[in-house]
Regions:
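Short, basic-rich loop-to-helix N-cap that marks the start of a DNA-contacting helix
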Residues: 38-49
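A short, Lys/Arg-rich alpha-helix, primarily the initiator
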Residues: 1-16
Length: 71
């Protein structure tokens, strides 16, 4: 399963959802969907903007863990 750790990186960088959404040109609602792991996909361009703003790597935000999301 894919795990989204965006909330962890945002907390480490002390960035609010609203601030990050504005800085990466997303609506707060869409960023919230990504943050909670409910997004079905993410564009590389969006991931790139988030990584740039949070000064991190994609693997800091998204990781793969063994197991099925539906277990």
């Amino acid at each position: 399963m894919i795990v989204v750790n965006l909330d962890v990186m945002m907390a480490k960088r002390k960035v609010s959802l609203t601030d990050l959404a504005e800085r990466v040109d997303l609506t707060p609602a869409n960023l919230s969907i990504l943050k909670t792991g409910k997004a079905r996909a993410v564009r590389f361009s969006t991931l790139e903007r988030i990584c740039k703003e949070l000064d991190c790597q994609p693997a800091d935000i998204i990781e793969y863990k063994e197991g099925d999301v539906y277990e």
